């Protein structure tokens, strides 16, 4: 395994990206479910 020069940069960016993707997915699913149930 190769040692990264800056090991703290990549996991923080990946966690932030996955966090934003999770929030966006939850937001979209909430809109879809609300429009489906209230239609």
UniProtKB/Swiss-Prot annotation:
Transmembrane segments: 18-38
Membrane protein topology class: Single-pass membrane protein
InterPro entries per record: PSII_PsbL (IPR003372), PSII_PsbL_sf (IPR037266)
GO CC annotations on file: photosystem II reaction center; plasma membrane-derived thylakoid membrane
Biological processes per GO annotation: photosynthesis
Highest rank taxon of the organism: Bacteria
Keywords tagged on the record: Membrane, Photosynthesis, Photosystem II, Reaction center, Thylakoid, Transmembrane, Transmembrane helix
Family the UniProt entry places it in: Belongs to the PsbL family.
Self-association and partners: PSII is composed of 1 copy each of membrane proteins PsbA, PsbB, PsbC, PsbD, PsbE, PsbF, PsbH, PsbI, PsbJ, PsbK, PsbL, PsbM, PsbT, PsbX, PsbY, Psb30/Ycf12, peripheral proteins PsbO, CyanoQ (PsbQ), PsbU, PsbV and a large number of cofactors. It forms dimeric complexes.
Functional summary from the UniProt entry: One of the components of the core complex of photosystem II (PSII). PSII is a light-driven water:plastoquinone oxidoreductase that uses light energy to abstract electrons from H(2)O, generating O(2) and a proton gradient subsequently used for ATP formation. It consists of a core antenna complex that captures photons, and an electron transfer chain that converts photonic excitation into a charge separation. This subunit is found at the monomer-monomer interface and is required for correct PSII assembly and/or dimerization.
NCBIfam families, A to Z: PRK00753.1
Protein name listed in UniProt: Photosystem II reaction center protein L
Gene for this chain: psbL
């Amino acid at each position: 395994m190769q040692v990264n020069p800056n090991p703290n940069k990549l996991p923080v960016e990946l966690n932030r990206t996955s966090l934003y993707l999770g929030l966006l997915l939850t937001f979209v699913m909430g809109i879809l479910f609300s429009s489906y149930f209230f239609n």
